[in-house]
């Protein structure tokens, strides 16, 4: 019985990384290319709304968060169907969903804070550093796709400190 909890914790941690990597690819290829717009027959306009965010510095990209909510909803429906048809226990549903939900909501919250002048997080050095990296992304949209973390930028060589 104890081993299952250890496995669940490990899977939960892995799901955090899966969500961060997914957010990186969504941002890099979903928001900065027209891939999703073309697949959706131009109904979603992800690149268009993200371009607006890049041109108006105090825009907190709430339109982008709509897409995150959309993805989280359909991921939850998928997991719920697995649960409903007894392919997944409720505990596993939580282990697979909560880390992704928390990671993506945290990314959105931190991202919104980057675009607010006197946010309460501004007193922390880590936040100032990450805000600097994010604002570099607005200057050069070909780097620093990470939002709350930048380990994927480091791994995929898209990190820029200048």
Outline where the language-model segments fall.
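Feature marks short, highly hydrophobic, charge-poor N-terminal signal-anchor/signal peptide-like helices
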Residues: 1-9
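N-terminal cleavable signal peptides for secretion/export
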Residues: 11-14
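Membrane-embedded catalytic scaffold of the fatty acid hydroxylase/desaturase
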Residues: 16-162
């Amino acid at each position: 019985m104890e081993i299952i909890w250890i496995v669940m914790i490990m899977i939960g941690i892995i799901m955090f990384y899966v969500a961060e990597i997914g957010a990186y690819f969504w941002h890099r290829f979903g928001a900065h290319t027209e891939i999703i717009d073309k697949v959706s027959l131009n109904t979603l306009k992800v690149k268009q709304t993200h371009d607006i965010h890049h041109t108006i510095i105090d825009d907190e990209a709430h339109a982008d968060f709509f897409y995150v909510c959309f993805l989280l909803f359909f991921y939850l429906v998928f997991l719920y169907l697995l649960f409903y048809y007894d392919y997944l226990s409720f505990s596993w549903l939580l282990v697979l969903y909560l880390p992704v939900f928390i990671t993506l909501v945290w990314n959105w919250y931190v991202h919104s804070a980057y675009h607010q002048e006197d946010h309460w997080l501004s007193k922390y050095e880590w936040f100032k550093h990450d805000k600097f990296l994010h604002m570099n992304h607005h200057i050069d949209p070909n780097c620093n796709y990470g939002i709350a973390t930048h380990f994927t930028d480091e791994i995929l060589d898209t990190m820029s400190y200048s």
